[in-house]
Amino acid sequence: MSIATDTNIGARSDRLVEALAGPAVDLILVTDLVNVRYLTGYTGSNGLALIGPDTRVFITDFRYVEQSAVEVDPSFARRQTSTAVDLADELPNVLPAGQIKLGFDDSHMSVAQYGRLGGILGDRVTLVPVGGLVEELRRVKDAEEIEKIAAAQAIADAALEALLAGPMIGRTERELALQLEHDMRLRGASGPSFDSIIAAGPHGALPHASPRDVAIEAGQLVVIDWGAQVDGYASDCTRTVAAGEISDTAREAYELVLSAQLAAVDAVTAGADCFSIDAVARQIISAAGHGEHFGHGLGHGVGLDIHEAPTLSKRIEAGADELRVNDVVTIEPGVYLPGEFGIRIEDLLVVTAGAPRILTSIPKALRTVS
């Protein structure tokens, strides 16, 4: 169990209430557990929150009564259902009287759940979709959130340095991934922030490859994409290393990706257009003839979820979104040659009004391992 230590949790609900004026709703029902955690501090697996100008209610079932008493911000009244079947059954007992416009997160609710919720609440409650409202609040991180992400990245960095100090050639991708994840836990992480990727040679040309029971061979590039989780917050980083001597083609491709990554990092600052930052890296890679081999976006936000707003990608419109102070984002260009190798270099950054704060400490010059 994790005890919430954020001093800003109560203020988050206040900010959410201010945001309710946009969609013109009286209250919001928060059901996604990551959003519930952000607003209340609760880390269990069954809970919801009802928030309005004069309402702060948290609902869970018997299994989490003691946990919620420790974790949930004291500004919330805590309620318990008699069963764990549907916490929404308790809502009629806590909603204010009269006609109500109730916001709900349609991006985290199935059609079946929506139908059941409407049946529970009846005609006096009008359900209004407000998907993404809490996620928008979560985007810009406060100081405590940033330090948790920084702590997660420091653990991840130390674990990778320990892995690279030992032998890799002859060991399997899966064996190395398990060692990396075990080491992060020993160093204080609650676990990996996502399933680690260790992919050698042609397998590295799959951007989201899964580690195999296949030994790494001399002469291969090895893509390592990993992260740690600390108090719910994620880190994310990628390094590509050389297992012994590699070909000139692979080395040149690595230097290309590195130059694109460095240029994109230099472009990160508050007010910068998210589409344009992606274009900085993409143009460098395309000019070298590898545009078709860089198919994913340049980066994404990181926080309680491993993928959050903002998105830095060619798939968004130019001018649609700008970086903000205290966005936490990845910069991760890559080149993937099917049947040959893959290369990705990724840092985790905090956006400032000037140059970004780079949370990743591992050097990016090509490293040769044994």
Stretches with model-predicted labels:
Residues M1-S370:
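Active-site neighborhoods and metal-handling regions in enzymes and metal-associated proteins
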